[in-house]
């Protein structure tokens, strides 16, 4: 049974999820405009990514304070603290990928523009499932488990796109070695967004199983 303090924590978790989602939306826009060649606009969007990530981080700290202030049974508090940290890592991964792109500003490989955006979109889909799984913890552990498993499946799909994209980049003779190394870093970091979402989904499974 979820009590009053627990409902307050879930309200704050929802707010945290929305902040992480805002980070990811700014991250997506940044990549889209960079791929189109608008570097100046991408620089502006980097500030949006950083601002939203900072907001998410502050909300994570608020959740931890609420938990240590007495919400949930002592045995469960650590699980939810860990979950908030893992969810926050998704925003961190997006910010890191954005920094890697904007610091190096590599030339976009011709013909691969759509595939880069596709990787971004497929990576962000993992968070959509993660968000649903997290919110489901409040009312239905079965739904939480189902959505956590979908997060894992989506991460695997994003992985396949990531590896295929890297293979294409490294097989191209018209891309310099330097550009290949930079894109390897950027693309791997985009994939990290999906990886971090999967990490959080594992924690949701743990919490859901304990509550069954």
Swiss-Prot record:
It comes from the Archaea. Disulfide bonds: none annotated. Transmembrane segments: none annotated. Pfam families: PhoU_div (PF01865). InterPro entries: DUF47, PhoU-like_sf, Put_Phosphate_transp_reg. Belongs to the UPF0111 family. This is UPF0111 protein PH1389. It comes from Pyrococcus horikoshii (strain ATCC 700860 / DSM 12428 / JCM 9974 / NBRC 100139 / OT-3).
